[in-house]
Amino acid sequence: MTLPGGEISKRELHFIWIVDCSGSMRDDGKIQALNYAIKEAIPHMLRESENNIQANLLISALKFSTGAQWIIAPTRVNEFKWTDIEAKGETDLGQAFLLLSEILRIPPMTERGLPPVLVLLSDGQPTDNFKDGLEKLLSEPWGRKAIRVSIAIGEDANMDVLQRFIGDNERQPLLARNPESLTKYIKWVSTVVQTASARPKSQQKYYDGSISNVDIPKPPEIISGATDVW
């Protein structure tokens, strides 16, 4: 929509990190690699958002271990700063989904926003009832329509749970086997997926709003090798 004077009215685009900081993330430097990768992605997110005249990018972050909590409220990308998180406790993914569902309601979300981008990063198995939390998340309109991406940090991550979060058989969880691949995947989701959300398919004759109305490009191919540590 164009405002009087020719200025374009931007629509909110929420980008939300959902980060596993359970005790197993201490192993093999996983939590340090995650902190580094997100910090590295911030300048790329800023450049991408500056080229997108349609979206007002807001970044927030939710961590889960024993319980779940918001650690960063929705923040404009040019003001966003990542503070390193520590790993300890359980893997209460269901609690994270319940917290997430609360902010994806309308309100506080607006009806005319762009599809949110939800990025789940985890290295293990949920220790609570994640199914009820996921059901609640998907019962919210923006929970269903969100672009949901999951990144497995190492071979021990529960790929079935991460696939259920995505909810689309045409896309699979991304498997990061080392710090380098984690950094590449986080950069990809921070830039390419952000841009895709800001350009949803204009019209679909039979689109019913039940899933995200967005085409997502393929992620980068990463070949396993001797540097794999997870």
Which residues make up each language-model segment?
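Acidic, polar low-complexity linker/tail segments
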Residues: M1-I16, C21-Q32, R105-R112
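Von Willebrand factor
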Residues: Q69, E79-P115, T127-N129, V149-V161, ...
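Extended acidic, low-complexity intrinsically disordered regions
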Residues: E135, G154, P179, S197, ...
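…and closely analogous acidic/polar surface helices at protein-protein or active-site interfaces
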Residues: L13, G23-N56
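Arginine/glycine-rich "motif VI" loop of SF2 helicases in the C-terminal RecA-like domain
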Residues: S49-E50, L138-A146
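Short beta-strand-loop
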Residues: Q54-D84, M159-G167
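DG-centered beta-turn motif at the end of beta-strands
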Residues: I18-S22, L34, A61, L100, ...
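Von Willebrand factor A/integrin I-like adhesion domains
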Residues: E155-Q204, D208
